[in-house]
Amino acid sequence: MCSAPNGRKNRPRSAANIFQIGKSSVRDPERRESTESARRAQRAMDDCRTTVQEFNTLVALHREQVISIGENTTDCPSLRAQMHKTRVKGCAVAQAAYQNLIAISGPEDGEIHPEICRLFIQLQCCLEMYITEMLKSMCLLGVLQLHRKGNDMCPELNMDCRVDESSDVPMLEDRSSSPMDFPQDSWVVCADIENIESDMREMRNLLSKLRETMPLPLKNQDDSSLLNLTPYPLVRQRKRRFSGLCCLVSG
C-alpha cells in the first residue's frame, strides 16, 4: 500500500461505494424520463387551458354580436359577416378544446386532477351558452327576414316632386324601392340561418360527446351540486358513487 505525499495511506474504494455509483447512474435516466414526462403533461395541461379560455372568449364575443343584431331594426351585412366569422372560429376551437381535454383526462376510474375537472365544467358551460346564443341569432335573423318581407309587400312610396319644363303642373315621381332589389340579400340571410342551424347540430353533438366522456364523479352530479366542490382530487373506486365533486371551478 503506497503512501500519499502528505503522509496518509491511500485507501481502496469499497465495493459498496462502487455499487452505489452504479445504482445512481442507472437511476439518472429514469429521473430524466420522469421529469420530461411531467413537463410534457404540464405543457398539455397548459395548452388545454389556453384553448378552453380562447373558446370562452369567442363565446363572449359571439354573445355581444348577437346582442348587436337584436338592437338593429334593419339587416346589417357587415355585422352578420363578423358573427359568421366568430361562429366558424368558435366551432373549430371548441373541437380542439374537446380533443385536448380528452387527451389529458386519463382513465375514468383513476385519479382526477382538479384542473381537469374545472376544464370539463368550463367547456360544458361554454358549449351550452354557445348553443343558446346561436339559437338566439337564428331567431333574430328570422325576425329580420320576416320584417324585410313585410316591407317588400307593402313598400312605402317615396314621392319626389319635379317640374316638367313643358307643363306648369308638377309631376310626382315614384322612387320607392322595388321588391326585385332584395332577393340577393334575402337569399344570403336564409343561407346564414341554415349555416347557424348546421353549426348548432355540430355543437350539440360535441356537447353530448363531452358529457359521455366526463369523469364519472362529474357524471353523477346534478347542476346544483356544482356549487359544492372539494379542493382535493379523489380516486374513484369501482361500483361506488361519490356524494361530492372533486375539483374547484374557480381557477
Swiss-Prot record:
Residues 1-43 are annotated as: Disordered. Signal peptide: none annotated. It comes from the Eukaryota. Keywords: Cell membrane, Cytoplasm, Lipoprotein, Membrane, Nucleus, Palmitate, Signal transduction inhibitor. Palmitoylated. Undergoes rapid palmitoylation turnover. Palmitoylation regulates the cell membrane and nuclear shuttling and the regulation of GPCR signaling. Upon depalmitoylation, it is targeted from the plasma membrane into the nucleus. GPCR signaling inhibits depalmitoylation and promotes localization to the plasma membrane. It is found in: Nucleus; Cytoplasm; Cell membrane. Residues 25-43 have a biased composition (Basic and acidic residues). One of its GO terms (cellular component) is plasma membrane. A lipid is attached at residues 246-247 (S-palmitoyl cysteine). It is a lipid-anchor. Its main location: nucleus. InterPro entries: RGS7BP/RGS9BP. GO terms for biological process: G protein-coupled receptor signaling pathway; negative regulation of signal transduction. Belongs to the RGS7BP/RGS9BP family. Regulator of G protein-coupled receptor (GPCR) signaling. Regulatory subunit of the R7-Gbeta5 complexes that acts by controlling the subcellular location of the R7-Gbeta5 complexes. When palmitoylated, it targets the R7-Gbeta5 complexes to the plasma membrane, leading to inhibit G protein alpha subunits. When it is unpalmitoylated, the R7-Gbeta5 complexes undergo a nuclear/cytoplasmic shuttling. This is Regulator of G-protein signaling 7-binding protein B. It comes from Danio rerio (Zebrafish).
